[in-house]
Structure formats: structure tokens, C-alpha cells
Amino acid sequence: MEIIFYHQTFDTPFWIRELEKQLPGARVREWKAGDNQPADYALVWHPPVEMLQGRALKAVFALGAGVDSILSKLRDHPDMLPLSIPLFRLEDTGMGRQMQEYAVSQVLHWFRRFDDYQALKLASRWQPLPEYRADEFTVGIMGAGVLGAKVAESLQPWGFPLRVWSRSRKSWPQVQSFAGQAELGEFLQGTRVLINLLPNTAETAGIINQTLLAQLPDESYVLNLARGVHVVEEDLLAALNSGKLKGAMLDVFSREPLPQESPLWAHPRVAMTPHVAAVTRPMEAITYIAETISRLERGEPVSGQVDRQRGY
């Protein structure tokens, strides 16, 4: 079995060594420009078109939860990866736990009004504030994939009303489900904290815009853990400046690294991290990929295959 590997920042020798340990008999090599030798599987992140084009592969694995970089290239180069070759993404591999930690910590930060107390501290003011009630602090999650389900699960013990919005109806315990465009408005009108975990598709690009934000209750919060392209940053800033939004926590941006001239840097009610909410953990990802390849080789069912029409 021949496997080609391409990632510009991962420790490639480590990945090759560990994959070969978990897949006895496999030969894993780093792909470099000009390598046209046969391969059975490709493990990639933002691959050049020539890496995949014309290859008779059994499957391609994206080394992350998102596959938008591959799908965007396919629009211009449809022969890069024929539909007959399945495309897989990392379903969890430790990312679910990281998203849980991030989401719970930020929701609690806002619920306990630590943002307000930090502002008072900077103003040298000693002022106890009224508490928020958990049963009135509704958290709405946009996106009902593996990560959205994990985040909802982690928030349940805290007593917040939970709701989810997705393409199709979900039956999650203790979570109110809204589905499709027809129910988006109702979902938003009752949401105090909006958590975005949507996939990056043509339908979701720019979804967090002026129209959407206007439907949230006054003094709501936005937590973006998905993709920067989901947020129209000018509309987000306008909502913050008008008081419609009380705060925003952003892990992803339309341009990364975030340009120095971006007004997001200096805004007092914007907090941010540099796209680190959930990173690929090598050993968990390697084990998932090795197990999935082994199941494919045995002809057994697997999960994680991307529906290219939907984009996730």
C-alpha cells in the first residue's frame, strides 16, 4: 500500500513514522512537486492541484475538520478529484474536546459578566453588577455536526436553555431544534449567545451579516469557531457599536493572519484568538486515519466521508 502525505507545517517525518507503525506493510512518503508515482491514498492539507490530478486513488483524507480548500479548487479543476474517489475529513480526533473547552469557558465568561468586570477594572471602578439568570441565558448553536453536538453536550450541565439550527431537524436531548431558512428567524430571536459551528459552503458564506444580527435580542453575544468567511466583519462591528451586540469572541477571520489595520484589534468588546480553538492532534488523527484505511481495505463501512454537494 502506497500513501502520499502533504502538509506544509506538520512534522512530516513524525507522521510518516507513526502511520507506518499503525499500518504494517504500508509505505508512506512525503509528496513533492514532480512526484507522479502511483499511490493508493493521499493525506493532504491545501494540496496543489497537481498532487491529486490524474491519480487512481482509493481515497483522499483532509487533515482537518474542514474541506473547503479542496472543494474550492475542485470548482476550477473538477478533474483534480473525480467523484469516484471518496474524500474524508477528520470527524473529531480530539477537536471535539477542544471546542467544548473553548465554548464553555467563553459562555461562562459572558454569563458571569467577566467582560463587564474587566472594563470596570480598567476604569478603576469597584461596582458589583446584577447577576444574569441561567434560565434566561439561551445559547444557540448554528451547525449540528460532530463539533456542534459536542458543544451542546458540554453546555447542558450549566442550566442554559439550548437550541440548535441546522439544515435538517435534530433530536438531541435537552436541545430545541430549528431547521432550514424558514425557522432561522425564530431561532435567532430567542438566542442570547450565538455560537457558529457551520461548515463553510456557498450557502453559509457571509451568513452572519446585518440581517441576521438584527434578529438577535439586544445585548447578545457572538462566538465564531467555524470560518472567518461566515462573518461580514463590517456588519459585526456596526452591531457592536450600536449596542445590538454586547460582545464578540472570534477565533477565525476572513483574512488570516488578521491584518494590522483591522479595526477588530482595537475594539474594546472584541476578544480573539489566532485560529486555535481546535487543532489537529497528531496521534488521535493518525489513529483515526489508520483505522479508516484498514476498514476500507477490508471493505467495511466507515464514517467521515464528505458529501461534496453539501460541502461537508
UniProtKB/Swiss-Prot annotation:
This is Glyoxylate/hydroxypyruvate reductase A. Disulfide bonds: none annotated. It catalyses: glycolate + NADP(+) = glyoxylate + NADPH + H(+); (R)-glycerate + NAD(+) = 3-hydroxypyruvate + NADH + H(+); (R)-glycerate + NADP(+) = 3-hydroxypyruvate + NADPH + H(+). HAMAP family: 2_Hacid_dh_C_GhrA. Keywords: Cytoplasm, NAD, NADP, Oxidoreductase. The keyword NADP applies. Belongs to the D-isomer specific 2-hydroxyacid dehydrogenase family. GhrA subfamily. InterPro entries: D-isomer_DH_NAD-bd (IPR006140), GhrA_Enterobacterales (IPR023514), NAD(P)-bd_dom_sf (IPR036291). Coiled coil: none annotated. Catalyzes the NADPH-dependent reduction of glyoxylate and hydroxypyruvate into glycolate and glycerate, respectively. One of its GO terms (cellular component) is cytoplasm. It is an enzyme of class 1 (oxidoreductase). It comes from Klebsiella pneumoniae (strain 342). One of its GO terms (molecular function) is glyoxylate reductase (NADPH) activity. Its main location: cytoplasm. The active site is at 227, 275 (proton donor). It is found in: Cytoplasm. Its EC number is 1.1.1.79, 1.1.1.81. The keyword NAD applies.
